[in-house]
């Protein structure tokens, strides 16, 4: 017989709202509306720990991920998991069978690769986007948080207006987070489009010379402050997505040693 030290009483009886595992990497396949996506996600899984328990059974959290992953990898059952948030909920459901808790959270971080077409040569380019999905279940209440991080660029309108049309350009990073009820259908691709379309211009992995020229022209035709980008993302997101919204845009300034930030909530 093994001693279950986790079930013992701790010396300091204070409840902990989040205890679990983090930075666990694995593999998963998602069937999103008939299209198969393969991910190497990083998981963080936590549950609450009552004041009278010394610890949680960590292996049961890993088992819950492994059980859900087996369904998300095997060819014959890959249609079960239709989104990253559905996969996260599947982990929670398995955890409910293995470990008592009142609140559970599953966070999934990964990279979503989307096919894009370059603006002039119309060549195929594979574009990476950092995404984060979380499902939080407390009692019967289930919420989700979806977050995308998109790289674009901006051209400064102030320098352009005061320098005979010449200006500085820089890479910008836009983050959009939506917090909603679990059953709300929100596509990560739509969130990415909202952010990407709000920059002076998108960026591309592949750019032939005509594409490079097209991107530069678009930037100069569409100068924006980081504030403009943040406002546009927020406006579009409020029109398109239910729930609470958080927008954060950082401009990696090309003529300063510091960066610029704009942030908003709705």
From Swiss-Prot:
Gene Ontology molecular function terms on file: GTP cyclohydrolase I activity; GTP cyclohydrolase IV activity; iron ion binding
GO biological process, one term: tetrahydromethanopterin biosynthetic process
Its EC number(s): 3.5.4.39
Cofactor binding, per record: Binds 1 Fe(2+) ion per subunit.
This protein's UniProt keywords: Hydrolase, Iron, Metal-binding
Listed Pfam families: GCHY-1
Pathway given in the UniProt record: Cofactor biosynthesis; 5,6,7,8-tetrahydromethanopterin biosynthesis
Biological role: Converts GTP to 7,8-dihydro-D-neopterin 2',3'-cyclic phosphate, the first intermediate in the biosynthesis of coenzyme methanopterin.
Quaternary state and interactors: Homodimer.
Protein name from the UniProt record: GTP cyclohydrolase MptA
